[in-house]
């Protein structure tokens, strides 16, 4: 980002959230409304009650821009959790292909390059980076994203469904089985009726990625169903739990 672009970014930032982060005890950077709803509800759980007793600044920022807050975080010395998506190629559904895939997330690439300037930001390398706790910068910034422990998810919603149904993105079920899962769980997700312009019968195989593609326009409704059914603790992805646990320290 050029100096002019950075200046424009901070002009905009001052208008929307400067006072909130300056006076905060800690900060959570997140991508969208579903993350905000989920994290705010999670902070009411006994496990994370220390966070509810502090002034936490919530800053909405996409994966391409969260890295731009690094200098400000360091200047203010505010312990910050950046929650983002690993964003590998969505068509990858085999573990080996997933691990070879490259993230498109600019913030993850930026922070990964500090430790590994000459390495590609493949999913396999990023998993190892996180396992080595290199995603934590000076105990001040924690880059929080999905790993193999979240069923190889690439988004929050995938990680949540993987956790609740004890599955991986590589797993598939018949459409009829997904219908039963939705009925039993009372979770509000969509099941596609068509794939590649062909009607899907109840015996046809549907992946979790098909489910999320069909639900993409109703993510907020899905999140409300999680909250209203009291599933926040049981559906908590490991990557989010790890980030919130670190932030409490």
Q: Residue spans of the language-model regions?
A:
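Acidic, Mg2+-coordinating catalytic modules of nucleic-acid enzymes
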Residues: 4-7, 11-29, 33-249
């Amino acid at each position: 980002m050029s100096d002019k672009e950075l200046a424009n970014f901070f002009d905009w930032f001052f208008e929307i959230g400067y006072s909130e982060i300056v006076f905060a005890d800690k900060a959570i950077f997140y991508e969208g409304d579903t993350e905000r709803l989920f994290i705010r509800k999670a902070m009411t759980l006994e496990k994370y009650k220390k966070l509810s007793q502090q002034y936490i600044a919530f800053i909405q920022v996409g994966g391409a821009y969260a890295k731009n807050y690094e200098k400000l975080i360091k200047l203010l010395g505010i312990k910050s959790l950046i929650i983002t998506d690993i964003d590998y190629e969505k068509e990858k559904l085999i573990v080996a292909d997933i691990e070879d895939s490259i993230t498109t997330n600019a913030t993850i690439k930026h922070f990964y390059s500090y430790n590994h300037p000459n390495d590609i930001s493949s999913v396999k390398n990023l998993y190892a980076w996180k396992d080595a706790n290199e995603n934590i910068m000076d105990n001040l910034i924690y880059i929080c994203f999905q790993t193999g422990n979240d069923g190889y998810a690439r988004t929050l919603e995938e990680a949540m469904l993987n956790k609740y149904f004890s599955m991986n993105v590589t797993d598939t079920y018949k459409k009829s089985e997904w219908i039963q899962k939705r009925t039993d769980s009372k979770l509000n997700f969509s099941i596609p009726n068509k794939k590649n312009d062909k009607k899907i019968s109840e015996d046809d195989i549907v992946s979790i990625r098909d489910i999320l593609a069909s639900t993409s326009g109703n993510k907020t409704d899905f999140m409300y169903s999680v909250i209203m059914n009291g599933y926040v603790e049981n559906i908590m992805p490991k990557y989010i739990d790890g980030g919130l646990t670190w932030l409490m320290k």
